[in-house]
Amino acid sequence: MPAKQKRLIHHWITFTSRKIVLIDEAHNPCRTMMLPMALKGLVSQAEGSNADVAIFHALCASAAYNLFELSARSNEQDRVLALYHDNEAVHHLRHNLARANEHRDQSFAMAIMACIAVEAVSGTTQRWRTHVSGGLAYLTQLQSQGLPEVALSAFRQHMVKMAIMCGFPVPDNLKAFLDDESGASDGLEFTFPYYGVSRSFLRAHDRINSFLTDSEEIRTAEQEKELDTFELQLYLDFPGLPPQAAPSATAISRNSIVIHHTSTAFYYAGLVFFQRSVRHAPVAAVQDLVELGVQELESIDQVGKGALGCLMLWPVLVLGAECGGPALQQRMRIWFQAQRRLGFRNLVVLEDLVATVWRARTVAGANEADAHWRRFIAQAQYDVFRL
């Protein structure tokens, strides 16, 4: 087993950890934090279960699933290894969840993140929801213990962003940092791993989630006026230009350009999502916005020249599913094909979902409301982690 694990960790270090996020930087926590914790887990696993052991198995599982996908799902040995380490990671995570109040470091929070990474790489459906719910519950517990802000901030930002983007309700006390006007939370779009996701975007998306929760209610004239104001704010909140880098700092400059294109892709996807899901606009009415968003996705790849990792997939899902004509749909097919080099199964499942939405709209007499990606992604076969 050690020789097989060594191969998996080698792949994690050289490929998976670098591709699981859009931009691989020197401070990538997938290496700087997870690897030391995984080492502790490897050394201590004979003594019993702990969060570090869960991290070790999660890294091995992610790497094995990644290798299996990169082999076009032909290497059965990698699949068997992936399932073994996946089961071990979940076993140790659950065991330590029962002792969550005993944890005094970041290892359990990182174990949750490592297991969510497994779900993304493997494309396993539905189970990711348990990890996100558990992460929010653990965050609530940590915050109630009055821990120092420095111990909470990174995990809170990570979990709250993830939950909002995945449509989870988040308690007000956990997302209060989004309304912080002191400037401490500015520039979120430049931080790992949610490149391109600004504080204002998260606030707006959280509000859209609440609109969708209340969608069955008949709005009053005052509520319609508030909705009009909110819609106008969405349109006006165009992403600003990234900070100017020194002319010689080529990599930094490239990363800033990539982040700007990513922010703009989120901007257009957010408008499309609002129009289609809250305003119930027809597909034809959002095609200008969709095309602009697809251009941003293409620009990210052009700037990255094949060296980037995986973009957060929410704008891809929204923009891809709302492509209304064959030309735009073909551009999205090409985009998805280019991402297969990453070996992440959730991309494959979302590509299939998008194509299913397109086909559903071509059926004679099809209701556009029924052929919405939100209806399809609720089905077990498509409910993958979409970030």
PLM feature spans:
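Acidic, Ser/Thr/Pro-rich intrinsically disordered transcriptional activation regions
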Residues: 1-58, 62, 69-78, 243-247, ...
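Central/C-terminal regulatory/activation regions of fungal transcription factors
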Residues: 3-35, 79, 120-293, 377-387
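Hydrophobic/aromatic-rich effector regions of fungal transcription factors
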Residues: 36-46, 58-75, 84-125, 135-141, ...
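Short coil/turn linker motifs that delimit alpha-helical repeat modules in TPR/alpha-solenoid proteins
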Residues: 52, 104, 152, 258-260, ...
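Residue-level recognition of the N-termini of beta-strands and the immediately preceding loop/turn
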Residues: 106-107, 156, 348-351
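Short alpha-helical linear motifs
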Residues: 132-136, 179-180, 313-316, 354-362, ...
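Extended C-terminal subregions enriched in glycine
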Residues: 306-310
